[in-house]
Regions:
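Conserved pre-motif I regulatory segment
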Residues: 2-50, 60, 66
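Conserved helicase ATPase motor motifs in RecA-like P-loop NTPase domains
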Residues: 34, 49-55, 174-182, 192-205
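Pre-Walker A (Motif I) flank of P-loop NTPase domains
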Residues: 43-49, 63, 80-83, 136-137, ...
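Motif I (Walker A/P-loop) of helicase-class P-loop NTPases
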Residues: 58-69, 97, 186-189
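Conserved Walker A/P-loop ATP-binding site and its immediately adjacent core
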Residues: 80-103, 144-148
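Conserved helix-turn-beta segment of the N-terminal RecA-like "Helicase ATP-binding" lobe
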Residues: 92-120, 193
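Conserved motor-coupling elements within RecA-like helicase/translocase cores
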Residues: 122-139
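SF2 helicase catalytic motif II
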Residues: 144-148, 153-197
Length: 205
């Protein structure tokens, strides 16, 4: 319904369907907190999502992010990374990558409405080079790897950073896990990232 009303890009009606991989595609009905998150993001306002396990927290940020990506690519097809999602553990990034792949189910190779890649230190040199050469719309990483990307002087990392210029979304999943010194480190990283990427309109979630 949101796509029909023009709130979301029309492609989102097909992307965000339940049961796609089981051949039982059905409309996805959003919870109130997901609708509120969408409204905030579309106004370029940062926000925090606090909700129970299994209540669709990830969709609270991925729906507005992917909607923005699809709309932006229609106007400017140049490849760049528009969103970085930081996870406290690689296992969470791996799991999220699998979930996002489900939303791409049914799209022919090379015709996916958005692209996503993991850059957590688990990747081979060839995989890192592919990310640098062919930047994903969404980059899944951890804060230590993001720190390395910003401080190392390897050509691959420089390319990744260059493709993130003007970053639009930065998500800190499981925000409550960053406490004490680590919390201070992450806060500083966010400030440095905003400055380095010239992300003046950055939405933090």
């Amino acid at each position: 319904q949101l796509a029909k009303d023009g709130v979301l890009h029309t492609d989102c009606a097909h992307i965000f369907q339940a049961g796609k991989t089981e051949g039982k595609a059905a409309d996805l009905h959003l919870y109130v907190h997901q609708l509120q998150s969408l409204a905030k993001a579309q106004k370029h306002q940062s926000f925090v999502v606090t909700t129970g396990t299994g209540s669709g927290k990830s969709l609270s940020f991925f729906i507005p992010i992917i909607d923005r990506i699809v709309k932006a690519k229609a106007a400017d097809p140049q490849k760049r990374t528009r969103a970085i999602v930081i996870y406290p553990m690689n296992a969470l990034a791996n799991s999220q990558l699998e979930e996002l792949d489900k939303f791409l189910h049914g799209y022919p190779a090379g015709e996916a409405p958005f692209t996503v890649a993991r850059y957590t230190g688990q990747e081979s040199a060839a995989e890192r080079q592919e990310i640098a050469s062919n930047p994903p719309d969404i980059l899944l990483t951890n804060f230590m790897m993001l720190e390395l990307i910003l401080t190392r002087f390897e050509d691959v990392d420089r390319q990744v950073v260059e493709h993130c210029q003007g970053l639009e979304f930065l998500v800190l999943d499981e925000l409550h896990t960053y406490r004490g010194r680590q919390g201070a480190d992450v806060a500083l990283l966010v400030r440095r990232l905003r400055e380095r990427l010239k992300a003046d309109q950055l939405v933090c979630i």
